[in-house]
């Protein structure tokens, strides 16, 4: 399929950078309709080795007020109508998602955030809901009992697909609201989300600039993401059809062509 939009390719500080807007320019693709597989496949084709997701989220904790950034390290995937794997035909793979984000890339994000003096929290659990509707009060309260930190609609199956593509992944979430659980704050609406996003836009852009300058120094050369398919593909070689190997050439040629 086609990715969400044309990928912007540029160079900054002698590094090649790619940007893709998940929802398309002008925000016309619903979370459930984002072709995450096409997005990740396209980035892999371009030689992308690291992905940093920047997205808006609701807060599930009093301490995470609107405007605060969260460097997410865990996810609870509550989505149910999205294609979540590249390995769904003839070739089966089971990648580990115990630690879905790359620690070195998270360290780079933290340094970039600190340089901008942004209020942030290192580590947090992101509940990924299907959407596009916001939570009911009962759902919001349920997620709070799970000790989750934030809630949003976009990081899954994105993080899973990045892992299958052996691309390191990190998530920086910008808190825009208190979802609907907080008795002293209005229930979340689009106007509220956009207002906080606009306020944080400059901070987020500067954070990305800082990140691009220094992220390579934080990357762990032994990060297990980069060769996770070595121990993930379970299908016997003689059962791997050429049709499917061709389909997966961008994602898994490193292991399928051995």
Region spans (language model):
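Metabolite-binding pocket within alpha/beta catalytic cores that recognizes anionic/polar moieties
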Residues: 1-98, 255-258
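Non-catalytic positions within long, well-ordered alpha-helices that form the structural scaffold/packing
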Residues: 44-47, 144, 163
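Short acidic/polar active-site loop segments enriched in Thr and Asp
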Residues: 49-50, 149, 168
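Generic non-transmembrane alpha-helical segments
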Residues: 104, 108-119, 206-214
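Active-site/ligand-binding-proximal alpha/beta "capping" segment
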Residues: 115-149
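Zn-dependent metallopeptidase/amidohydrolase metal-coordination segment
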Residues: 153-190
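His/Asp/Glu-rich mid-to-C-terminal helical/loop segments that flank catalytic regions of hydrolases
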Residues: 180-227
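Acidic, Ser/Thr-rich low-complexity intrinsically disordered segments
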Residues: 229-258
């Amino acid at each position: 399929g086609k990715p969400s939009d044309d990928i912007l390719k540029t160079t900054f500080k002698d590094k090649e950078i790619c940007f893709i807007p998940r929802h398309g320019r002008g925000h016309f693709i619903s979370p459930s309709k984002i072709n995450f597989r096409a997005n990740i496949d396209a980035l892999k084709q371009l030689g992308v080795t690291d992905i940093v997701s920047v997205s808006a989220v609701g807060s599930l904790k009093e301490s995470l007020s609107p405007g605060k950034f969260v460097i997410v390290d865990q996810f609870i995937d509550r989505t149910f109508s999205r294609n979540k794997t590249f390995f769904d035909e003839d070739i089966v793979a089971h990648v580990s998602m115990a630690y879905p984000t790359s620690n070195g890339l998270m360290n780079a994000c933290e340094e970039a955030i600190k340089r901008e003096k942004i209020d942030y929290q290192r580590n947090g659990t992101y509940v990924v809901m299907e959407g596009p509707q916001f939570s009911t009060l009962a759902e919001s309260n349920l997620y709070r009992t799970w000790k989750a930190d934030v809630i949003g609609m976009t990081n899954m199956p994105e993080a899973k697909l990045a892992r299958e593509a052996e691309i390191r992944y990190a998530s920086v979430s910008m808190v825009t609201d208190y979802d609907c659980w907080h008795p002293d704050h209005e229930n979340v609406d689009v106007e509220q989300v956009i207002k906080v996003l606009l306020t944080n836009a400059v901070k987020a852009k500067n954070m990305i600039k800082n990140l691009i300058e220094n992220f390579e120094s934080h990357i762990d050369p032994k990060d297990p993401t980069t060769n996770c398919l070595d121990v993930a593909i379970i299908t016997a070689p003689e059962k791997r059809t050429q049709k499917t190997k061709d389909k997966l050439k961008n994602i898994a040629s490193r292991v399928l062509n051995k």
